[in-house]
UniProtKB/Swiss-Prot annotation:
<dbReference type="GO" id="GO:0019240">
    <property type="term" value="P:citrulline biosynthetic process"/>
</dbReference>
<dbReference type="Pfam" id="PF00185">
    <property type="entry name" value="OTCace"/>
</dbReference>
<dbReference type="GO" id="GO:0016597">
    <property type="term" value="F:amino acid binding"/>
</dbReference>
<feature type="binding site">
    <location>
        <begin position="277"/>
        <end position="280"/>
    </location>
    <ligand>
        <name>putrescine</name>
    </ligand>
</feature>
<feature type="binding site">
    <location>
        <begin position="54"/>
        <end position="58"/>
    </location>
    <ligand>
        <name>carbamoyl phosphate</name>
    </ligand>
</feature>
<keyword id="KW-0808">Transferase</keyword>
<comment type="subunit">
    <text>Homotrimer.</text>
</comment>
<comment type="function">
    <text>Catalyzes the phosphorolysis of N-carbamoylputrescine to form carbamoyl phosphate and putrescine. Is involved in the degradation pathway of the polyamine agmatine.</text>
</comment>
<dbReference type="InterPro" id="IPR002292">
    <property type="entry name" value="Orn/put_carbamltrans"/>
</dbReference>
<keyword id="KW-0620">Polyamine biosynthesis</keyword>
<dbReference type="InterPro" id="IPR006130">
    <property type="entry name" value="Asp/Orn_carbamoylTrfase"/>
</dbReference>
<dbReference type="Pfam" id="PF02729">
    <property type="entry name" value="OTCace_N"/>
</dbReference>
<feature type="site" description="Important for structural integrity">
    <location>
        <position position="29"/>
    </location>
</feature>
<dbReference type="GO" id="GO:0042450">
    <property type="term" value="P:arginine biosynthetic process via ornithine"/>
</dbReference>
<comment type="similarity">
    <text>Belongs to the aspartate/ornithine carbamoyltransferase superfamily. PTCase family.</text>
</comment>
<keyword id="KW-0963">Cytoplasm</keyword>
<feature type="site" description="Important for structural integrity">
    <location>
        <position position="145"/>
    </location>
</feature>
Length: 365
């Protein structure tokens, strides 16, 4: 068996590896459209740990495992108390012995890091308070699939230095992941937000190191909406989450109306700009209906590619770990078990016949 690899952060991947995942995603998407997805994970099980619920993450991973011939087991919020009733180490070891992979949507990034530390099977990061790498893989794949300048090119032929991605709104985990994967590929990333909600310097430092390694791209954090001009992608996210409900009023005052994605803002970006949103969206809050439902929006194509991304990531990380037994070995164990059960069946029938005969004899007496 190969050394176990985990998917925790796109920073752990090289540019070449990202392209490999994209190519795999493209093949599997084409196969799904043809109704011909190969069952590469047949009879395999993915444990899905959710510390908070999610529609797209759960449905996409479950559907992906089903299409690939496997099974996804949903461990819902409150059903599995990591590190409470049982240590995280013990839980991880048990899941490693019963399942072929673990996906975790965690409240704290440390949880996923520790899962990966203890696991003997691949761990996939379904979201933490720090990042959302499965979303990032999906998003860049979608950008390159739909931008006119890139959709017909091989990934190595794309001029990433000419691509500008503008993220408007709060410094969410999606913002973090988008900043880091785009700069790793050498794109230009801009985060536009009120100063209080801007990306922290440590995120920018990582982006700058990515730019240095890629030898192209740029990163800018600003409150200046003029920087949306000439954007290829305009991206936004929710302004607050469930655990930030007490801040909702304050956040609305900070973002509305200046940082709403409106038709006027998209016009300022330019007709080439495509709109993206990781969803769920608060319509007419961070984005107007007229934008998310417009021809410039690829938000729902982006959502579909969550399934594409999960298929690609599951195959990329789980398939190399599978013990690929020959048909001869499979036939051997099938025959061995069937022979055992046939013997048990005969023994059961003999006991059943003996008991019936004994009962009939006793009744006659």
């Amino acid at each position: 068996m190969n050394k176990v690899r985990h998917f925790i952060d796109t920073q752990d991947l090289s540019k070449k590896e990202i392209f490999e995942i994209f190519r795999l995603m493209k093949m599997l998407k084409e196969a799904r459209y043809c109704g011909a997805v190969p069952e590469l994970l047949k009879n395999k099980t993915l444990a899905m740990i959710f510390e908070e619920p999610s529609t797209r993450t759960r449905v996409s991973f479950e559907a992906a495992m089903t299409l690939l011939g496997g099974h996804a087991q949903y461990l819902k919020p409150g059903e599995l108390h990591l590190g409470v009733r049982e240590s995280l180490y013990d839980t991880t070891k048990v899941l490693s012995h019963m399942c072929d992979g673990i996906m975790c949507r965690a409240l704290k990034h440390e949880t996923v890091l520790n899962l990966a530390k203890y696991a003997d099977v691949p761990v996939l990061n379904g979201l933490t308070d720090y990042n959302h790498p499965t979303q990032a893989i999906c998003d860049v794949f979608t950008m390159l699939e739909y931008m006119p300048a890139t959709k017909n090119l091989e990934y190595e032929d794309i001029k990433f230095e000419d691509i500008k991605v503008v993220f408007i709104g709060d410094r969410t985990n999606v913002c973090s992941s988008t900043m880091h994967i785009t700069t790793k590929l050498g794109m230009n990333f801009v985060h536009i937000s009120p100063k209080r909600y801007q990306s922290p310097q440590e995120w920018v430092d990582i982006a700058n190191e990515n730019i240095k390694q890629a030898n192209s791209g740029s990163v800018l954090v600003t409150d200046d909406l003029e920087q949306v001009k000439d954007a290829d992608i305009v991206y936004t996210d929710l302004w607050w989450w469930v655990d930030q409900e007490d801040e909702a009023e304050e956040r609305v005052k900070a973002f509305k109306p200046t940082y709403q994605v409106t038709p006027e803002l998209m016009k300022k970006a330019g007709q080439q700009a495509l709109f993206m949103h990781c969803l769920p969206a608060s319509r007419n809050v961070e984005v107007y209906d007229e934008v998310i439902d417009s021809d410039q929006s690829i938000a729902f194509e982006q959502a579909e590619n969550r399934l594409t991304a999960q298929m690609g990531l599951l195959v990329y990380y789980l398939y190399p770990q599978i013990d690929k037994s020959s048909n001869a070995v499979k036939d051997y164990y099938r025959g061995k078990v069937e022979a055992f059960m046939e013997h048990q069946d005969r023994s059961w029938k003999q006991r059943y016949t003996y008991n019936n005969d004994y009962a009939e004899t006793k009744n006659k007496k």
